[in-house]
């Protein structure tokens, strides 16, 4: 039921020099499904990550953060689906560490140079026997063109793989950017289960890469929401292999802006693909708040509207009960909001002006917009010059069915 989700063909996915990927069936999620993915990175690759702010952080998130904090090289990633290894306490932490150790032996790299990722059911022990038994097959499958298989291998309730690939000219040289993401529910990243892996063959200095990962997550994965739930496992990883002959050492370098913009476009596309494939989604909604006093209040309003079950179900039904949007704006937490200055558009239709119904608004016009698969909700607060945008979807009967049946 994905909403206008465009998936490139396997032949359109560009390998990133310095990245090899292998996928295997380990039987962690269900029999006959690829559920274990390994990335091997060339020596000299730089890696940075942004992780969930949920206080109930999954074991692999804790291990990733610890390994990155050591400041050494990262040579491999390992991702399992079907089990989140979250809410598993000390045994879960040991399982994440043991996963790194097992892969390290196969690749002949130290365990602390490996980052583990898990996605799936929370509060269940990771089946280490199946995971470790599947690692040799994933390693044997390592190849430069493994992105398409990996996009399938990290899926849980996703209906389609999420992949982005492009080439850009940076400083007269060709740079490749390819990434994958997964997530369909429990999506309100705050740095769904949301995982994102984005790689480039450009070289980026490690301190700059860390800052860039934060900035990219903030304009992409931190601007989407499906159901308002922030996962225990949200992770976004940015990889720069340095194989393209282009190196950026500081934000002042001439090549930086073009590289940053290309990476931001890729990250935004991967994030929006998650919303387009959200559990049961039939509508893709852009909530844009303008004339805010600052970014914080713009996002407060945008998320209040995007998270409202009443708003989301109204969009599913194509029911222009748009007072629900005004109500959400009102409880967004801006105490000194002057509603008499507020304006609201649904697509190109002005619904509310000066805090009340536009005298020229006709419900048939609102319904015409709400029947569309992609809808823009634009809100002007009349408080300043700041604008920001959040992407979300509707709530359908299928969303309830998927989550009610998730463990069946």
Swiss-Prot record:
It is an enzyme of class 2 (transferase). It is found in: Cytoplasm. The active site is at residue 193. Keywords: Acyltransferase, Amino-acid biosynthesis, Arginine biosynthesis, Autocatalytic cleavage, Cytoplasm, Multifunctional enzyme, Transferase. GO terms for cellular component: cytoplasm. The record marks 119-120 as: Involved in the stabilization of negative charge on the oxyanion by the formation of the oxyanion hole. Its EC number is 2.3.1.35, 2.3.1.1. It comes from the Bacteria. InterPro entries: Arg_biosynth_ArgJ, ArgJ-like_dom_sf, ArgJ_beta_C. Substrate binds at residues 156, 182, 193, 279, 403, 408. One of its GO terms (molecular function) is L-glutamate N-acetyltransferase activity. The record marks 192-193 as: Cleavage. Pathway: Amino-acid biosynthesis; L-arginine biosynthesis; L-ornithine and N-acetyl-L-glutamate from L-glutamate and N(2)-acetyl-L-ornithine (cyclic): step 1/1; Amino-acid biosynthesis; L-arginine biosynthesis; N(2)-acetyl-L-ornithine from L-glutamate: step 1/4. The keyword Cytoplasm applies. It catalyses: N(2)-acetyl-L-ornithine + L-glutamate = N-acetyl-L-glutamate + L-ornithine; L-glutamate + acetyl-CoA = N-acetyl-L-glutamate + CoA + H(+). One of its GO terms (biological process) is L-arginine biosynthetic process. Its main location: cytoplasm. HAMAP family: ArgJ (MF_01106). PANTHER family: ARGININE BIOSYNTHESIS BIFUNCTIONAL PROTEIN ARGJ, ARGININE BIOSYNTHESIS BIFUNCTIONAL PROTEIN ARGJ, MITOCHONDRIAL. Catalyzes two activities which are involved in the cyclic version of arginine biosynthesis: the synthesis of N-acetylglutamate from glutamate and acetyl-CoA as the acetyl donor, and of ornithine by transacetylation between N(2)-acetylornithine and glutamate. Heterotetramer of two alpha and two beta chains. Belongs to the ArgJ family. This is Arginine biosynthesis bifunctional protein ArgJ. It comes from Bordetella parapertussis (strain 12822 / ATCC BAA-587 / NCTC 13253). The gene is argJ.
């Amino acid at each position: 039921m994905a909403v206008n989700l465009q998936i490139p063909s396997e032949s359109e996915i560009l390998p990133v020099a310095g990245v090899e990927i292998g996928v295997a069936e380990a039987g962690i999620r269900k029999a006959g499904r690829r559920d274990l993915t390994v990335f091997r990175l060339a020596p000299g690759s730089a890696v940075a990550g942004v992780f969930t702010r949920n206080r109930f952080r999954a074991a692999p998130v804790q291990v990733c953060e610890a390994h990155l904090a050591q400041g050494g090289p990262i040579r491999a990633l390992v991702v399992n689906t079907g089990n989140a290894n979250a809410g598993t306490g000390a045994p879960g932490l040991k399982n994440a560490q043991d996963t790194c150790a097992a892969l390290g032996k196969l690749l002949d790299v130290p365990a602390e140079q490996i980052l583990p990722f898990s996605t799936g059911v929370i509060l269940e022990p990771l089946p280490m026997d199946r995971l470790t038994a599947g690692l040799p097959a994933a390693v044997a499958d390592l190849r430069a063109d493994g992105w398409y298989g990996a996009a399938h291998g990290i899926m849980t309730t996703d209906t389609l793989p999420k992949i982005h690939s492009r080439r850009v000219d940076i400083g007269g040289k060709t740079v490749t950017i390819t990434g994958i993401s997964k997530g369909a529910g429990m999506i309100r990243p705050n740095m769904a289960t949301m995982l994102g892996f984005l790689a480039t063959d450009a070289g980026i200095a490690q301190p700059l890469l860390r800052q860039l990962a934060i900035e990219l997550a903030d304009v992409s994965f931190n601007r989407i929401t499906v159901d308002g739930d922030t996962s225990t496992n949200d992770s976004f990883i940015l990889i720069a292999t340095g194989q393209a002959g282009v190196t950026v050492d500081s934000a002042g370098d001439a090549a930086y802006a073009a590289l940053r913009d290309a990476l931001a476009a890729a990250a935004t596309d991967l994030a929006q693909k998650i919303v387009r494939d959200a559990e049961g989604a039939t509508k893709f909604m852009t909530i844009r708040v303008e004339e805010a006093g600052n970014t914080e209040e713009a996002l407060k309003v945008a998320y209040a509207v995007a998270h409202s079950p009443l708003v989301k179900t109204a969009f599913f039904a194509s029911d222009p009960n748009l007072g629900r949007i005004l109500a959400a704006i009102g409880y967004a937490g801006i105490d000194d909001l002057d509603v008499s200055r507020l304006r609201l558009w649904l697509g190109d239709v002005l619904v509310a002006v000066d805090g009340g119904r536009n005298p020229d608004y006709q419900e048939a016009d609102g319904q015409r917009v709400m029947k569309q698969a992609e809808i823009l909700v634009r809100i002007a607060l009349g408080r300043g010059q700041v604008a920001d945008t959040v992407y979300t979807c509707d709530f359908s009967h299928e969303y309830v069915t998927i989550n009610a049946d998730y463990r069946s």
